[in-house]
Amino acid sequence: IAQKILINGKKEPLFPGVFGIFGHGNVACLGQALEENQKELPTYRGHHEQNMALTGIGYARAKRRQQIFVATSSVGPGATNMITAAGVAMSNRLPILFLPGDTYANRMPDPVLQQVEHFNNPGITANDAFKPVTRYFDRITRPEQIIQSFPSAIQTMLDPADCGPACIALCQDIQGQTFDYPEEFFKERVHAIRRPRPDEFQIKEAAEKIKSSKNPIIISGGGVFYSDAMDELSNFAIKHNIPVTQTVMGYSTMKRDHSHYAGQIGGLGGRNTNNLAKQTDLAIAVGTKLADFTTGSWANFENENFKLVSINVSRFDANKHLAQAVIGDAKVSLNELSLALGNWKAGEEWNKKSQTELKSWNEEVDKASAPSNQEIPSYVQVIGAVYKNSDPSDIAVTAAGGLVGEVVQVWRPRELNTHETEWGFSCMSYEISGALGIKMANPDKEVISFIGDGSYLMNNTDIYSSVITNNKLIIVVCDNGGFAVINRLQLFKGGKEYNNLLKSSKTPGLVDVDFAKHAESMGAKSEHVNSISELEEAFKRAKKSDVTYVISIKTHAYQWLEGSAFWDSPTLEIPTTEENKEAIKLYKEGKSKQRQGV
């Protein structure tokens, strides 16, 4: 409660709230403390520990890591249910504070309910599973330990370079104990996220490399959001005439009508941006960890003279693939690098080529996403219908499956900050839980979640959460009969359809799920539609609704936009089918272009 943060010059709570599911491991002591302080620190009831934590993570991303939710559970399954969410936060460099209950520090009642026992090490508990997926972990076995532990956790979560989840496991017997804490520990403290400046030498070296390039591109990542560097990115691109591509996490850091906007790059990118990547002799990566879907598993950059400049607040990310590192805040670094470049700019023909290819690709996407006479619509047709009837400020949310790549091609940003995804861990069911957190952070905006039937069936309880907390979502359920995108990969690798689509699984009692009725049972308004025209009308009704609105529609399981980048996904070394042989051939072609460093 005493922890505050400056956001745009205004003092705000660092911790806006707690998501909690109480059990014997946290209800009697921590639960009572939360009840007694609910006006200053509200607690929101969860319905699944993973989901409530994902909601907190979605909130933190939408708030650009400036506010942090707490997630608390009991010991045992409640705690381990949050492990997946911790992985989401860890891989996406997002803050959340986990406070799981733990076993007794004094061990007198061992084994307690839900305790896992390690015969060779009684100090290990289920909460040790948090260690690989948190930036900071501690177990409180004495009450005075929190004097050092909590400030350390906070500084980790607020550190722009080391940001990630923190876990402080609270032993049950210690939660209720007293200690004569110093008054200073409870005094208000105001935080501000630091903006480290880059080293002058690194700026100089980066500027020299850029000046020697002829066809540079920018790769804009999620760090541009967290640094609030969208204006600086725009100014840099215009001044130095450099096309801007975007990662999935950096999508909507630039608007579609910007003179240097190029679109999505890499495995989910368009042919236009991947053509730029093949030809570029230098990429300026800004705030991106350069994941495989961004780089085409490092096979996208085919120019033998290719060089990489990486602007990143994290030393670890900035130095990847022998890049010329610029270790610093994106906003500050772009300004200083621009000063070092002076009046230098790339040739006019390069960005003209980028815009020409973008126009051609957009026309192809528009044609694919337009309504047609086919009986079952494709993903892009569904997304196109929603996009056509949406407002520029509406926020699209995706996470797993084929919808992520289709949305970034169709949902071309008309305003900044209008696309949110979870593509670090690609966690199924984040589409609903994360969308709820994004809505809580943006109560005045429409939040539209695109989700497949596979993700929906995996976890959907936050439809109910959104209803009872008055956080309206629009959820578009695309039912293509199973895990269609992995079925696509299975076929691409030369395999036979097996255990992905429902029809190719062991399902003798197969029935269709009525997603609309299921959502309705949780208090949402809902309807099933059978065509794109019906979808458009349903979406208009959803926009007018004051409660969560779920629209389900059958979608094509085999129809996708064409991919144009390599992805290093394993292939059988010894083929067993003719299809395997073709897959191996394509795999070897891609591997032959993969860079060993830069």
Ranges and model annotations:
Residues 107-120, 267, 318-319, 326-327, ...:
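Thiamine diphosphate
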Residues 141-144, 167, 182, 309-400, ...:
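Phosphate/pyrophosphate-binding active-site segments
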Residues 21-30, 358-432, 438, 444:
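Active-site diphosphate/adenylate-binding microenvironment
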Residues 172-175, 403, 557:
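Short, internal active-site loops enriched in acidic
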